[in-house]
Amino acid sequence: MQKVNKKLNKVYRHPIILERKGNAIQNNDGSWTKSEWVEFRRVFANVKNLHGEEYFIAGQTNEQGTLKFYIRFMPGLNNETKSSYRILFKGKKYNINFVDNINYADEELELKAIERGMTDAAI
């Protein structure tokens, strides 16, 4: 099932899962249980690879696992909260490293994400 945003002329054809990092839990003995990732929302996205100049600017390390995900606007997902979310796409996990509310229109978000394991921020 394809979702089309006619105003932006984009097809959201790829199902992705956004996960949110849960809170760490303190056990009865005072130790802490590591926080788990939990499914936050299933959405459809337009997915693109970085290319050209954009690829080289991002290329501080091996950025071949960097993708751009375009999704409908979601309140609360922004650059301040990006580390609390990650993306599951085609069996791989992606850490979000940039969120752009395109033209501040509150209609669509561009999420730049790096495949987990290709960055030191892999949690």
Predicted features and spans:
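N-terminal intrinsically disordered, low-complexity, charge/repeat-rich segments that act as generic
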Residues: M1-I17
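Short, conserved turn/kink motifs that form compact alpha/beta structural patches or helix kinks used as
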Residues: V4, R20-I25, W32-I123
